[in-house]
Amino acid sequence: MGNTDSKSSSILLNHCIALVRPEDADASSPSRTSSPSPSLSVDADPLSLNLSIFKLDSGPDVEALFSDKPNVPLDTVFNDFYLDFISVDVQDFSINSSFKKILHIISSLNPPNFNNLIVFLSLYIILSANSLPASRTGLHSSRLINAIKTLSILIPIYFDRVKSSTQDHYDVFWATQHEIEGLPLQNIPLGERLLLAILKLAFQDNFTTAVTAHPSELWEIGILTNSNKYRSLLNMHHQWHLFANRLLLLRLLAALFSSDLYTSGGKQDINMFLVYWCTQMPKDKSIQFTSSLLNCTMRFILNNNKDFQSLKANFFSSDATASNWQTLYFQFVQSCLHVLNLSMSYKAQDNVITIFLTQLQREYDLKLILSSFIKIFKYPIDLAIEQESNIFNFTNNKHIDASRRRAVSTSSHDNSSSSHASLPSSSSAAYHTKPQTKPQLPEIHPLLIPMTILMTNLIDCNKCFQNYFADKFASRFIIFSIYYLKYYDYSSLSSSSSTTRSNSSTTSNGTSNDTSNERSIVELNENSVSQILLPLLNHLLLILTSKKLVLFKMLQTFNLNYYTNNLPNFYKLSNINGDINNLTFRDFTVIQLSNLILDNIKFNLQPNPIFYELIYNLLPINDEILTSSHKNDDSHDDLILLSAKKKSASPSAATSSHTSSSKLSYNAAMSLLYVLSKSSNKVYLTTYATPVFKTKDIPYMISPGFKMDLLALLLRSITIFFTLYFDDAENLLFAMVRHQSITHQINDSINSISKALDMNPNLNSHIMTLKQMGFNRKVQWKDFYQFEEITDLPQVNLYSSANQQHQNQQQGQNDNRGQNQNEDPGQENESPTPYLLFNPASLENETPGTVKHFSSTNHDKNYQVIAFIDFKSDSNLNLQHQLEYWPHRPQWPTPLTFTHKCKNPKYENFNEVWSGTVYLQILLRVIKQILSKVPEIPRIKSVQYFETLSKLSALRSDILTTIHPRLPLDVRRLTTFQPLSMHTNDKLLMWFHIATWANIFTQTSFKYEETFSHELRQFESLLDISIDECEGNTISKPTTDRLGYIRRSRGQSSVSLERTISAGSGVSTPTMALNRTKSNGSGNLMNYFFQNTAQNHFQHLRSSSSSSSITLEKTTSNSSSIRTRPNSHHVAPETNNNNSTNGNSNNSSNGGFSFFKWKWGGNNSNGGSDDTKASQRDPNVSTSIITDNLNSYMFEEEISPGVVNNIIENNIWVGTDIRLFKIANFRKESFSFLEMTSSFFKKFKFINSDNDNYNNNEFDDNTQLRYTSRGLYR
């Protein structure tokens, strides 16, 4: 990486210091026409001085600008000191954490000047929006773009300081006119004017819309347009700068809405920008803007493949140019979704955006939105089908391993069960065997999470869209959502393999391996799917299955062609006997859910209640549920059937239809019996489950009590099913009678537990009064991995004070030994026998397992840094935490609630007060009565099956008459089934808001270089501070003597940025070029789209190189301007200095450009080539030439990688103290060539370790860091 012009570097350094010491501002610009306010005393504290935003005697011009008179040049109004900040591109500031720290220092040491800089940038954007587009020059547009970029960087720092301050102070954006003297705001807050300016710039000619566009024209055709004809991008490829400017505006909006990031999840602060944006903007412009965002997103999803293929074939000169365009457009669409989701996250009745989306009811609009979501939602499923049908896959033995959520090797899968049988040893040969890789499941689409958030909001607010979604896609959405729950739940994978990781994550000396850190990155980023996408799908599943229309649709049968061609082979059912045309969506779903439950039981994983709740909603239904919903006054479901006609009322047709769709199939019935058999095992019911994450906040969700409640919920669902719809439950009743031993096993298990509890009355009282059931000792995490197979009930040791004291002593010894060995507490001396008593105090000292993502930082080296969300330890996002768990669950039936349990008598036997006892006794009585009438059921052959069902159907009235008095009162009153439903509450809305921000942060965080340069250390010494210690802490002000030394040390070496005013235009332009050079190794931009397959259709990869600025050069050739492509042909040569051979040379080969790689100390003899070229340029170059080159990228038909990176990789919020969720940083040292060669053998060993999968594929130094749908950079 070459060095920029040293003069401009010195100017920017002086400006940064001048913001801290305002009285020193004149030294940075001797020709300045203004000075600090003369009303301030000379003896005032230098840090209290306030640099004026406007020039002296500019009052009339300022009044004219605020009076909507756009003919006043902005350069004649604003102080040149502030104009310097937007005279060069500051994009690189945003990706350098050290510069973020300097900005934090400026904000802390001198808040007035930092606020003035923000006010200046805001005013420049506001006044530029009011100016006529035709009057703008290239310099003006370039400064406007830089102002938008710079304000996007400063806003999070401003919010960080304001939210963390304990003192009350006014907000510059929402202050009154009296608090901001000199600004004729006319009682309109600055923040509102800024939002209005952004809205105006969003539809301004030659900035965000085409010159020929109408002011009320949308960005894209679709919603709110009479014409349905798609306007292809083929006619707009040469105007890519319009999309770049739109992206910048959307990023600025997201930054303005981000004040919530700096408040804790439980604190409710008013987000003024979001409130004003949703309620105070002009209604017509807000609707126009919202429609444009929707249309651009939907058209991109539906039409991008065809468009980009045509662009690549007919217009672009190279594949790289096409990739740059695709990357830019993808980021633009992604930002559209971010702004839409943030706008809808503000729940208020006067939200204009929500009101508009609520009123969408035209079928074309609804179809456009739904079709786009379906394409994104089915993307990985279509890729899996395509991978299976690929002819080249038949030539090898590799296949998709979908048995344990992800593709793993056969050997590792076989060893996964053995890891539960005994404590794994780090020396075990099984863990040093090199695995044989298999093709992994396709990645989800990067837009799936924000699109799912958008769909959730639309279903919640728009009744027409909810009805359309339920009628057209709900049944298929349910089966595909279960596909995601089955194969993309990485949390269950991490819990089953955490023992192995705990033994391999540290070395013998306790230091962390690079491989384990990289693996931690993989796991934590996979949690963005497990902790955001899957809860969203769970929420939608519960909402949809509570609707009678959706339940009616689930009784429809599969089409043979659809089942064959639209489901992956590994997701199809293997035990289906008979015609696929008789398989209903309900049967398929129940079987898949049963398999998931059995899988969790097999490995004793933490139960997932969504599986049981979905079975509860889907099981007790028949084909009359849609019509019966209109007969009940208590039903709030008013969705109507849109697509299919109701079935014929003829008896023959009704009978045939009833047989094929309404009855539960025998295969589905047997799946439920397997669940009852395994979940009622005595060992399973009396042991803690393996927790998803190591945390002390989830005793109930892994406790035996939770397992018993889920079993009771399943028994209640079966009881309601045959009580309300006896004929449809015949197959299930037949299976339960034929396998009557299962119900007796449930009864025996409950009785055994009850007898064990009866032996200790005190223990029994605890069980009856507490919701939790647990151990009476500290939980030993390794005990969770000693459960392999369900056998007999072990001996139950009862609680006593004597053995409790002995256990406490033994526990302390085990803890000390475990800490000395750097392992989790709980060794082989600790008995794994469970105790059926929950002692809350036993978990107080349990420390949740955490992964150390920070390594010791060496200030002499450079690091690649990635900021990501630590989902595991974040209690606001991770729904596995106790407090955040229950708001996301539906209200269970009254007999299973905590309130009902508290009403049970204290000293009753457990088998009498257990929530499932009443349903179990009813089932036992029904089975006994059926066997007394039809005793041959356990011995019949398949040919007698239908005859036996006829006999069973004849017993309907007798059975219902017998059990009716014994039914619980709430079941007895039911005339139609009432499914579980979700109810919106404040905690649920808060989680959705946090999840929205978590997705935005994940998708806008990029890799950046953390460089500790000599100039940065000099800056620290001059200000007498330590930047490394200034992360969120109070920064002490430097003394006046120290600031005086700064002024004297700068002396005559300060260089000014002189300006000349072009006659007639009034536009000030620099007299010298501000050049920035770029190495040949930077700007490598990877494609995220390829065109031939479904996978290549959506594959998105972000550039691993840091952003690069546009080279601004002034050249003359025969008095005409020469347009140069940025960072392409006219790039200043790289400076060859003595430092190019040492360890710092990796800075130049790196793709990123750092603010602190500039030469701060003034002119450098080694950098003379750049200065010489600058001094040899003609000082009399005309303004038109300069302005054209300053904004030349706006007129180039082909987009360069440097420009794309410059616009995209901004890391707006990285480096600030985000408090809404927990942020972790992963640092990886950047090795120079010399360091890499000196550690060749170490590197060789690193590559050939047993974790070579991670080294070679995930974080190899020689590979680019790629962005995947899980937020992983590799």
Swiss-Prot record:
**Which Pfam families does this chain map to?**
Hid1
The superkingdom of the source organism is Eukaryota
Identify the GO cellular component terms for this protein. Answer: cytoplasm; Golgi medial cisterna; Golgi trans cisterna; membrane
According to the UniProt entry, which residue ranges have a biased composition of type Low complexity?
27-42, 409-432, 494-515, 803-822, 1135-1149
Ordered alphabetically, the record's keywords are: Cell wall biogenesis/degradation, Cytoplasm, Phosphoprotein
Comp. bias intervals (Polar residues): 1110-1125
Q: Where is this region: Disordered?
A: 23-42, 405-439, 494-517, 803-842, 1100-1149
GO biological process terms, semicolon-separated = cell wall organization
Q: What is its main location?
A: cytoplasm
Location of this chain's protein in the cell: Cytoplasm
PTM-bearing positions, type Phosphoserine: 635, 1065
Q: Does the record carry Zinc-finger as a key word?
A: no
Q: What else is known?
A: Present with 1080 molecules/cell in log phase SD medium.
Q: What does this protein do?
A: Seems to be involved in cell wall organization and biogenesis.
Question: Which named protein is this?
Answer: Protein ECM30
Q: Which organism is it from?
A: Saccharomyces cerevisiae (strain ATCC 204508 / S288c)
Gene (name only): ECM30
